[in-house]
């Protein structure tokens, strides 16, 4: 069990060594989601991993049939996603993660996470999958990878009614130094810290 909200016995350096120079993907005209998608395209093109964004479910309300052989959707709306944003395979491991962004400087609102998403993450972790969240603080230009186990335990403390302090994220997560190719090199952290390092040994405990 982790001490909450931000008590740890020692300071741990959890910064990705990708680059000592911070690169802001926003300066390249990219949103956080676009940067993740761009990174996934890079991984796919270079035969590193196959990771895709899950389609948002759509509820069709009304359909017109201007011709017998054609159907035209005239009214529909997006439904709330039931799981997480991304999934795929990396080095024979199932990868599943959610991505969240905030303009706040000191915390990540837990209202951004829904109970069914937390439950999905629990199931992925239980089955041995690699599950995490990518958290981007746009004002600070900082991005972190937080293992799902820490998110789940924090969520269970107050059932998502509060915010997760940035101090907590910095202590239990891993900062991602932005790159150029890929824009968000999150898989290096996954490989180093979740597939072979000390963090992975306790990942599913």
UniProtKB/Swiss-Prot annotation:
Keywords noted in UniProt: Cytoplasm, DNA damage, DNA recombination, DNA repair, Endonuclease, Hydrolase, Magnesium, Metal-binding, Nuclease
Catalytic reactions of this protein: Endonucleolytic cleavage at a junction such as a reciprocal single-stranded crossover between two homologous DNA duplexes (Holliday junction)
CDD domains cross-referenced by the UniProt entry: RecU-like
Residue positions binding Mg(2+): 83, 85, 98, 117
Cofactor: binding comment: Binds 1 Mg(2+) ion per subunit.
Pfam family, one: RecU
Enzyme class: hydrolase
Required cofactor names: Mg(2+)
UniProt EC number: 3.1.21.10
GO cellular component, one term: cytoplasm
UniProt site (Transition state stabilizer): 100
GO terms, molecular function: endonuclease activity; magnesium ion binding; nucleic acid binding
A single BP term in Gene Ontology: DNA recombination
Main localization category: cytoplasm
Subcellular location: Cytoplasm
Similarity comment: Belongs to the RecU family.
Function of the protein: Endonuclease that resolves Holliday junction intermediates in genetic recombination. Cleaves mobile four-strand junctions by introducing symmetrical nicks in paired strands. Promotes annealing of linear ssDNA with homologous dsDNA. Required for DNA repair, homologous recombination and chromosome segregation.
Protein name: Holliday junction resolvase RecU
Organism field: Streptococcus suis (strain 05ZYH33)
